[in-house]
Amino acid sequence: MNDKDLKEEKDEKYSKDDKSDNEEKERLLRQIELAKCELLKNKPDDIIEPKDIDFRKNLPIEDPYLKSHPDLYEKMQKDLKRLIYRSHLPIFDPSCYEIEKKIGEGTYGAIFRVINIKTKKKYAMKKIITNNIISLKYLKSEFEISYQNIHPHILSIYGINIKCFDSHTFSLCVLMDLGDKDWDVAIAERLRNGKNYTEQELISIFKQLASALIYLQRDKKIAHRDIKPENVLIFKNTIYKIADFGEAKATKYNNKINTLRGTDIYMSPLLYNGLKASKEDVQHNLYKSDVFSLGYTLLYAISLNYDIINELRDLDDSQKIKKILYEKLKPRFSNNFIEVILRMINPDEKTRIDFIGLEKLIKDLL
């Protein structure tokens, strides 16, 4: 084959790759547009913009202490306005909803199933009580990330409501999509029923979650930092969405960070070893840490328990990890699927793939 033929072959290969990339981008754009349409369809009619809110409804006007301290009342009103105006989140009216049932309890508050009194549509409402306005700002940022990043596999947020109960107690209510259950609950049900996931089921779930995380890295420069089954919600039995962006970090200028974040069992080796050594700072690549956590999340779903993770947890030899994984997963899973997981849980961060590399690997192997 002469140089001209080689050049033509290379050009043809690049042309096919470009075409494939463009088709993938178009497919993602179509998915995002559909997600936006779904969001608009489900948007409650009580949602208003921050500029239209009557702040007096959200302040404890009758509080005796505030009545005798008008300067404090004025400060609270300013704090509340600042919180809402700077949030870029619409406001919803909790009085338009009836609480049906408490469906969950998180670190910062309870989650309820609520029904819109007028439309009868059901939603989830998270309610957080705090006496620290700084922590309120931090918690609010979690929901801003979800609201601003519309994707078919990221939980939809419709609005918030911030209220003062007295001179120092605030509540933050968040209205969002109502899922059937979180993935951790579904995995526990499978364990009780003795029903393992098939490879095709896991590939479908994996592709959904990976598409959201690829989108966050490539298009938004955001890392989640706490990927685990508890932070994945299931809709209609087959649709999986990432939730809980409380630890998420924008990485526009730097994708390495020193802070330790995440849940220890799903942490990358750098973070896990740092935690064991009681280190406060561990420099690591945020995206590659998320890839590792997603890999361990898949292993948990495969075994329906922590057995495989516990066996691999303290290993730093890639060949030993590979040997164990093949012994545990063959013949239930194909070589291609096992190889994808191995690339994700590579103990060496330098050679572990990020989500952009994972996107290509999914195309090539799955």
Where on the chain are the PLM-derived regions?
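Conserved activation segment of eukaryotic-like protein kinases, specifically the C-terminal portion
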Residues: 257-275
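Conserved N-lobe ATP-binding subsite of Hanks-type protein kinase domains
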Residues: 110
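Catalytic-loop of the protein kinase fold
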Residues: 217-235
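Activation segment signature within eukaryotic-like protein kinase domains
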Residues: 205-206
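Conserved short submotifs of the Hanks-type protein kinase catalytic core
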Residues: 168-182
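Juxta-kinase regulatory segment immediately upstream of eukaryotic protein kinase catalytic domains
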Residues: 40, 44-92
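Short beta-strand micro-motifs within the conserved protein kinase catalytic domain, predominantly
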Residues: 156-172
